[in-house]
A protein has these predicted regions:
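Positively charged n-region of N-terminal signal peptides that target proteins for export
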Residues: 1-8
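Hydrophobic core
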Residues: 9, 13-17, 51
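Sec-dependent signal peptide cleavage junction
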Residues: 17-34
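Acidic Gly/Asp/Thr-rich repetitive segments characteristic of extracellular carbohydrate-active
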Residues: 70-127
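Detector for repetitive beta-architecture
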Residues: 90, 96, 106-108, 113-115, ...
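Extracellular beta-strand-rich solenoid/capping regions of secreted or surface-exposed proteins
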Residues: 100-105, 117-154, 164-186, 192-209
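Feature marks extracellular polysaccharide-active and adherence modules
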Residues: 112, 146, 154-156, 178, ...
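Short glycine/acidic-rich loop motifs that flank beta-strands on beta-rich extracellular proteins
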Residues: 120-121, 164-174, 193-202, 223-230, ...
């Protein structure tokens, strides 16, 4: 009997041991961990540096308008000071010969012909007189009006472009005044007859002269300058159209007391670059529409 009880006890202990081992081998039941996500936070607000911020383009307005390099239009018409003193004898001309014969002091030359080409004069390049001569240039003679005072050259047309004085040589000025005083050129057109291109001569020139007035004229190229003046005093260039000159509008060298008012400058320069509205050298008291002429270079 004791043996039987001992056997039963042994079997019970063995069953318990086996039951414990089986439990150890089984994976314990676990609860699946919940998936977590990072908390969504707003991106920090940043300030863009001023150098990176998009800016709107700004417009700069100059206190004093600066003219374009090759053209300029006066803000208002100029007012000329008269240069003619005393009486004049009026002479109407229609040919180059008549024009040359009329050159004298105290004279008003009124141009009636649509065109006077100085190269058609009978004594072109060879004739001369007390008040004019011809200077030989590279490609032809240049007319020089000399030693006269109180002289007017005026076109008789309704507009300045109705009457034209011209010259063929491209190295010659169309009309030059030398050692003259009280000269008035008005209401007329001056320019070279040949098509635009390279020229070494300009349109209207004053040398060693004083009290000259160029008013209401059309001065065109291919001349290098519309008006050139050297060693002269008291000149006025008023209310003209100066255009298509290869170097520029007006040029003054060793001059004093010059006014350039109310003019329009257009198409100055050539294929190599724009021209100057005004150029001065060794001058005193040069103004353009009341401003210092040197600022318009």
């Amino acid at each position: 009997m004791k043996r039987f009880c001992a056997a039963i006890l042994t079997l019970s202990l063995l069953a318990a041991a086996l039951s414990g081992c089986g439990a150890a081998q089984s994976a314990p039941e676990t609860t699946a961990a919940q998936t977590t996500f990072p908390t969504e936070t707003a991106a920090p607000e940043t300030t863009v540096p001023e150098t990176q911020q998009e800016t709107q383009p700004t417009t700069t307005v100059d206190a004093v308008p600066v003219p374009q390099y090759s053209q300029y239009e006066a803000p208002q018409p100029g007012v000329a000071e008269p240069v003619i003193t005393g009486s004049q004898t009026a002479v109407h001309v229609s040919t180059a010969d008549e024009f040359l014969a009329a050159i004298a002091s105290d004279t008003e030359i009124i141009v009636d012909a649509e065109l006077i080409d100085f190269s058609t004069a009978t004594g072109y390049g060879t004739s001369g007189g007390e008040h004019y001569r011809w200077d030989e240039e590279f490609d032809g003679p240049m007319l020089i009006v000399q030693n006269v005072s109180n002289l007017t050259v005026r076109g008789s047309g309704d507009a300045a472009t109705d009457r034209v004085l011209s010259a063929v040589p491209r190295y010659a000025y169309v009309l030059t005044f030398e050692n003259c005083s009280n000269i008035y050129v008005t209401h007329i057109t001056l320019g070279h007859t040949q098509e635009p291109g390279y020229c070494a001569g300009g349109v209207l020139q004053f040398r060693s002269s004083q009290s000259g007035l160029v008013e209401d004229c059309d001065l065109y190229g291919c001349g290098t300058w519309g008006v050139w003046s050297e060693n002269s005093l008291g000149l006025q260039v008023i209310n003209n159209l100066i255009h298509d000159c290869s170097y520029g509008g007006v040029n003054f060298y060793t001059c004093q007391n010059v006014r350039v008012d109310g003019n329009t400058f257009r198409n100055l320069g050539d294929e190599y670059g724009p021209g100057n509205v005004i150029r001065t050298s060794d001058c005193e008291n040069i103004t353009i529409d009341g401003a210092d002429g040197t600022t318009f270079r």
